[in-house]
């Protein structure tokens, strides 16, 4: 075990986000592996409702990397981005003759990790 390794990964979580995990995953699949700046540009122009909480969690992860680890935001890359199912919010809709139908509004948990990119100049060595 080496104890001299520096930590270069910061993470943030968004809990109980209103929206289904599958709809959040389709956005996370497109930004995973991209740089912070590219991901923000992509999220700004995507036509999905889930981009707002994802942007909020991504900015929180970058702020954690900047404040806690002293990393430069321009050198950060999204290493992991996951959306897990949360507990459903149970609501009831009144129906005819005194009945009630259950409505389950889906929630999800968003987790994003950002890490520093290794900027090596291997292209210059011809």
UniProtKB/Swiss-Prot annotation:
InterPro entries: Ribosomal_uL22 (IPR001063), Ribosomal_uL22_bac/chlpt-type (IPR005727), Ribosomal_uL22_bac/org-type (IPR047867), Ribosomal_uL22_CS (IPR018260), Ribosomal_uL22_sf (IPR036394). It holds the Pfam family Ribosomal_L22. PROSITE patterns: RIBOSOMAL_L22. CDD domains: Ribosomal_L22 (cd00336). GO terms for molecular function: rRNA binding; structural constituent of ribosome. It comes from the Bacteria. Keywords: Ribonucleoprotein, Ribosomal protein, RNA-binding, rRNA-binding. One of its GO terms (biological process) is translation. GO terms for cellular component: cytosolic large ribosomal subunit. Belongs to the universal ribosomal protein uL22 family. Part of the 50S ribosomal subunit. This protein binds specifically to 23S rRNA; its binding is stimulated by other ribosomal proteins, e.g. L4, L17, and L20. It is important during the early stages of 50S assembly. It makes multiple contacts with different domains of the 23S rRNA in the assembled 50S subunit and ribosome. The globular domain of the protein is located near the polypeptide exit tunnel on the outside of the subunit, while an extended beta-hairpin is found that lines the wall of the exit tunnel in the center of the 70S ribosome. This is Large ribosomal subunit protein uL22.
